[in-house]
Amino acid sequence: MGKQNSKLRPEVLQDLRENTEFTDHELQEWYKGFLKDCPTGHLTVEEFKKIYANFFPYGDASKFAEHVFRTFDTNGDGTIDFREFIIALSVTSRGKLEQKLKWAFSMYDLDGNGYISRGEMLEIVQAIYKMVSSVMKMPEDESTPEKRTDKIFKQMDTNNDGKLSLEEFIKGAKSDPSIVRLLQCDPSSTSQF
């Protein structure tokens, strides 16, 4: 009986096959693990923050985890179901650079208006610094979240309107691998793209 519940139904599997980069076997394995960790089939923000904290034991990942959670929770119901989880995981782990950048843009665009303001960028950068600053030495021109935000805006805000469009964000990130690494919160990777 329990085994039947831990397998994806054929129509769900078909949907996920079409919307992710995972194989049927990988989807089934992820689903089993998801149900093991989330028996209700839904992940709350508090549960998500606890899981996320395991990946960043030397920093405070809670604020950044809230932003990631919001971006995973595409229907805005305050929980992440398996479909939301696996689609976001597919984009962030196996998606093409452009997909990852669109996903990152949606995380940085806190109010969903299609632009990233300086304040929105600063909020995310502050969350990243809280998470990694104890284990990462930042260059002098990025030693504070404010300096990092200013540097990003100088590089990306090509029309100087004080906000970043999706186009500016993607173009700017693609032209600076260090920004791509920061946006993906993967400071250890040096030549991912």
From Swiss-Prot:
Recorded hits in InterPro entries, A to Z, give: EF-hand-dom_pair (IPR011992), EF_Hand_1_Ca_BS (IPR018247), EF_hand_dom (IPR002048), Recoverin (IPR028846)
The residues listed in the UniProt record as binding Ca(2+) 3, with positions renumbered to this chain, are: 157, 159, 161, 163, 168
Query: Quick one: which residues bind Ca(2+) 2?
Result: 109, 111, 113, 115, 120
* Lipidation sites (N-myristoyl glycine): 2
Name of the protein described by the UniProt record: Hippocalcin-like protein 1
The protein's organism comes out as Xenopus tropicalis (Western clawed frog)
Q: Which SUPFAM superfamilies match?
A: EF-hand
PANTHER family hit by this protein: CALCIUM BINDING PROTEINS, HIPPOCALCIN-LIKE PROTEIN 1
